[in-house]
């Protein structure tokens, strides 16, 4: 089984999607799912003394403008593990440019955590936490000499639109599994 190609994008897209976690919150190791084999590989250890502030992964059967699966960040109170599947509710869209490429990311919360039951949109997230996420992504490649431009945040509706677009981009690239 290759989770990138064989899992659905979610049980109720775009309201609830599957987040396939590659990197748990608190990690300095950057793992990536190998798109051909479905195995997880260590891409690199972060050059800077930063760690991921969220669980980080992809939405299965999506493709994005950076020529990779569509990224998703899930706010977790405790880290999960690589290759964990989380039913996640999109609440925002983080917009950034990575070395000249559009590299937007969905921000989501786990459906099965009652702590986040009232978090429906970006305005429900404390600004200090959004600033922390933005700071991480602005600086995490700095010691590699790569430039990241943070464009800011948009709400849940923007995230849902991009998820649907990313599913269509996947179908264009890989064909439909339906």
From Swiss-Prot:
Disulfide pairings: none
Pfam families, per the entry: Pyrophosphatase
Keywords: Cytoplasm, Hydrolase, Magnesium, Metal-binding
Matching PROSITE patterns: PPASE
Binding residues for Mg(2+) 1: 66, 71, 103
Gene Ontology cellular-component annotations: cytoplasm
Sites where the protein binds Mg(2+) 2: 71
Catalytic reaction(s) noted: diphosphate + H2O = 2 phosphate + H(+)
Record-listed E.C. numbers: 3.6.1.1
Keyword Magnesium: yes
Record's signal peptide: none
GO biological process, one term: phosphate-containing compound metabolic process
Cofactor: Mg(2+)
Name of the top EC class for this enzyme: hydrolase
Highest taxon of source: Archaea
InterPro entries in alphabetical order: Pyrophosphatase (IPR008162), Pyrophosphatase_sf (IPR036649)
GO molecular function: inorganic diphosphate phosphatase activity; magnesium ion binding
Principal location class: cytoplasm
Binding site for substrate: 30, 44, 56, 140
Assembly and binders: Homohexamer.
UniProt family annotation: Belongs to the PPase family.
HAMAP family, alphabetized: Inorganic_PPase (MF_00209)
Role description: Catalyzes the hydrolysis of inorganic pyrophosphate (PPi) forming two phosphate ions.
Protein name: Inorganic pyrophosphatase
UniProt source species: Pyrococcus abyssi (strain GE5 / Orsay)
Lineage, uppermost ranks: Archaea, Methanobacteriati, Methanobacteriota, Thermococci, Thermococcales
């Amino acid at each position: 089984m290759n989770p990138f190609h064989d899992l659905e994008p979610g049980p109720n897209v775009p309201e609830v999607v599957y987040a396939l976690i590659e990197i748990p919150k608190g990690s300095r190791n950057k793992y990536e799912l190998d798109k051909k084999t479905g195995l997880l590989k260590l891409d690199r250890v972060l050059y800077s003394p930063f760690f991921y502030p969220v669980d980080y992964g992809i939405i299965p059967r999506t493709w994005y403008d950076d020529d990779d699966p569509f990224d998703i960040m899930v706010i977790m109170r405790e880290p999960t593990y690589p290759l964990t599947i989380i039913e996640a509710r999109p609440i925002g869209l983080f917009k950034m440019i990575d070395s000249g490429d559009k590299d937007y990311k969905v921000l989501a919360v786990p459906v099965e955590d009652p702590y986040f039951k009232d978090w429906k949109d970006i305005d429900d997230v404390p600004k200090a936490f959004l600033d922390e996420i933005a700071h991480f992504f602005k600086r995490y490649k700095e010691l590699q000499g790569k430039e990241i431009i943070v464009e800011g945040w948009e709400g849940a509706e923007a995230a849902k639109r991009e998820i649907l677009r990313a599913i269509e981009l996947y179908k264009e690239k890989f064909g439909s599994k339906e």
